[in-house]
Amino acid sequence: MVKLTSIAAGVAAIAAGVAAAPATTTLSPSDERVNLVELGVYVSDIRAHLAEYYMFQAAHPTETYPVEIAEAVFNYGDFTTMLTGIPADQVTRVITGVPWYSTRLRPAISSALSADGIYTAVPN
């Protein structure tokens, strides 16, 4: 038998979760806020899998990255301000250019955008 206090606690937890959910915003995939979330995930992924990125870069020496990304990877402070102003096409190119984009980066980016209440849509 379930106690009423357990039910009340469950209802309170659900209500708190709903209240804590961020407001949703629909943005263009090229919006700088979307790019900053994507780059934040990318920088975190590089930090977590640095050897893979080094091997990828060694195999693709002509692949270039914005200098701001390298600075953000090795600066363990708040790097988000370093990443502003990188053109959306460069963000897309570097993030989608690695073999693990579909399996690791895209799901992490989707999760991060959703956690921030951001959804993307291509403008008509």
From Swiss-Prot:
InterPro entries the record matches: SRP1_TIP1, Yeast_SRP1/TIP1_CWP
Annotated PROSITE patterns: SRP1_TIP1
GO biological process: fungal-type cell wall organization
Superkingdom, natural source: Eukaryota
Keyword terms: Signal
Keyword Signal assigned: yes
GO MF annotations in UniProt: structural constituent of cell wall
Family label: Belongs to the SRP1/TIP1 family. Seripauperin subfamily.
PANTHER family attached to this UniProt entry: CELL WALL PROTEIN CWP1-RELATED, SERIPAUPERIN
Name of the protein in its database record: Seripauperin-17
Taxonomic classification: Eukaryota, Fungi, Dikarya, Ascomycota, Saccharomycotina
